[in-house]
Amino acid sequence: MTENKKIDILMATYNGEKYLSEQIESIISQTYTEWNLLVRDDGSSDNTCVILTEYEKKDSRIKVIKDNKGNLGIVKNFEELLYNSNSEFIMFTDQDDVWKKDKIEIMMRYIDDSDLIISDAIITNENLELQYESLYSVVNSRNGIVKNIIKNTYYGCCMLFKKIILDKVLPIPENKEIGHDLWVGLISEKYYKVKFINEKLLYFRRHSSNMTTINKSKRSIKAKIIGRYIILKELAKRFREIKKRTNY
């Protein structure tokens, strides 16, 4: 049973002052209350850190990770947060979305017989006005390593997973073709149980700073082929390492 199990929610921030408070408030308002929000800022030049400090003072569940590692980029920022996580269950959150108040509660109902679950989302514009009813329908979300190498449908903001997967996920390869969520999804498909659930549990906000997270079609065919080759190469390398270490 997962009732009252602690969850670490990981947030990597960078110049996110515009929507940050709205996202954090939606987490604070969750019906499931056994969570910690771990945040690491990646060198913001706006008021992001001021906002985070205020929330950290107001809610003991919110913890800002401070270190001297400087700007790591989004993937390594999330990786650092993964290394700092101590709870049995982990979620990613973006700095600009809005969670439905029962997002965690509903996802925890599904996690018992899976290791990674991924929910649907409602896609909105920057003002939270409806653009698409379903993220699944836009990106054709479904299981499969090859399918998701061709077009990634693993979105970190829609994930809940068990900490046990980190044994094989970490470290995340240092390559711009490999996002933290794509890597978590691919490794989980190989070694663990992954389930897509038909629940729309957040408002996925699209704005000028994140539009490419759904549509990368402007890349050339050559660039796409090279990118997928790099992903396959890194996967094969990790599979060999895991086989050598675990004989699996």
Report residues per predicted region:
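Cell-envelope/extracellular polymer assembly enzymes that use nucleotide-activated donors
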Residues: 5-8, 36, 183
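Conserved short acidic donor-positioning loop in nucleotide-sugar-dependent glycosyltransferases
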Residues: 27, 42-43, 68-69
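Conserved donor NDP-sugar-binding/catalytic core segment of glycosyltransferases
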Residues: 102-131
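Short aromatic/hydrophobic "clamp" motif used to bind/position activated sugar donors
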Residues: 90
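Conserved nucleotide-sugar donor-binding catalytic segment
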Residues: 83, 143-215
